[in-house]
């Protein structure tokens, strides 16, 4: 963030042909974009979303309404262009990349797929560590690699998406661990489990959290209770942060990955924009911890990066605010 550019952009904002604060929160977004890009008139072009996919051993606890094979089936759907994220990305001028870091089963070669499978799904986090520290490191590097590709191919703003049956359980455990919250605050219904499924999710998260001990680093915590795609998402955002890009958050699992990235690099928070507020109850706690206001509140609970991609045109519009004429430039009298 460039404080001098922020001040210059604020001065220009106060002179634009509109009443003060008439564009509300979008004005703050515009100022942040200007400071991030180091220019008073920010420009946002094509976006990119990297959908990180992996399976979860914790599905053995009965925490999901869908069977594990849906993860692989949905990845194939992404590659064929048939998912919600594909359709929203077409509308939002956003490229879609898919990253396999732990899907059970083989996937075909595809130009939009980066195969970096660390292992075929995590171990059951309710019974023991989800992965080894070395596996967590590999997942992190895979996310970084996918982000580098997206940036090299022209992304000017970057989002992550997620796919993994059982991943709201892992996201809840990771969020609770990183923010010091009880399971009840962060465990939601995910894909739509009933009361018994919700109880099992809370128990699984509680058992995972009980194994943690003081002094563990963020990546150690993620290896114990997280998911391969959640760690990869942290890598995606870390790489985007180091490249200086605006970073758009999706829902609960993606924001869990972003929390991990933030714990590893606190300066990353200045680059984050909350695309939306998810239906998952833990998402509000995540955004509050990051100090972020969501751009959209549409009762979404799909994942895939959909909420982040829906917000991209809004971010582009916010950037254009500072391209408006000032009262002096337009020859308009001030009130």
Swiss-Prot record:
GO biological process, one term: cobalamin biosynthetic process
Organism annotation: Thermus thermophilus (strain ATCC 27634 / DSM 579 / HB8)
GO molecular function, one term: nicotinate-nucleotide-dimethylbenzimidazole phosphoribosyltransferase activity
NCBIfam families per UniProt: cobT_DBIPRT, PRK00105.1
Catalyses which reaction(s): 5,6-dimethylbenzimidazole + nicotinate beta-D-ribonucleotide = alpha-ribazole 5'-phosphate + nicotinate + H(+)
Gene3D superfamilies: 1.10.1610.10, 3.40.50.10210
Protein name as it appears in the record: Nicotinate-nucleotide--dimethylbenzimidazole phosphoribosyltransferase
InterPro entries referenced in this protein's UniProt entry, alphabetically: Nict_dMeBzImd_PRibTrfase (IPR003200), Nict_dMeBzImd_PRibTrfase_bact (IPR017846), Nict_dMeBzImd_PRibTrfase_N (IPR023195), Nict_dMeBzImd_PRibTrfase_sf (IPR036087)
Enzyme class: transferase
Protein's UniProt keywords contain Glycosyltransferase: yes
UniProt KW Glycosyltransferase keyword: yes
Keywords associated with the record: Cobalamin biosynthesis, Glycosyltransferase, Plasmid, Transferase
Any Pfam family: DBI_PRT
Family statement drawn from the similarity comment of this UniProt entry: Belongs to the CobT family.
Top-level lineage group: Bacteria
EC numbers on record: 2.4.2.21
Function: Catalyzes the synthesis of alpha-ribazole-5'-phosphate from nicotinate mononucleotide (NAMN) and 5,6-dimethylbenzimidazole (DMB).
Active site: 304 (proton acceptor)
Pathway this chain belongs to: Nucleoside biosynthesis; alpha-ribazole biosynthesis; alpha-ribazole from 5,6-dimethylbenzimidazole: step 1/2
